[in-house]
Amino acid sequence: MAECIFCKIAKKEIPSDIAMENDHVLAFKDIKPSAPVHYLVIPKEHIQSIAHLEDNHKDIITELIYSAKKLAAKLELKGYKLVFNVGKEGGQVIDHLHLHLLGGWTKGE
C-alpha cells in the first residue's frame, strides 16, 4: 500500500498551508473546507483512526486537542467545533487519524 497523503504532508513531501507544528503533531488548512475556517490537526506518526489507538498512543489525543485549542486562539476564533470522524461509516475519508478544527461562522450562519 502506498504511503498516505497525510504522512507525506507530515514529511513535507507534499506542500500544504501549515499553521502550526511541533515534534508530534502538525496542523494545516483543509483543501476542501467545510467551514469558513477549516484546519486538520494530525499526528506525525501514522495511526489509521481513533479505533486503531494503542495504549502507547494515549497522549496523542490530548496533544491533538490542545494543539487545536492553541491554533483556534492564534486564529482568534470566538467559537469552533472539534471533530473526529472514525471509519468510512463515520465519515473518515483519509485513513490517518485527524482532528477537524472548524470555525469562522458569523451569527446566523
Regions found by a protein language model. Name each.
Residues 1-109:
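HIT superfamily nucleotide-processing domains
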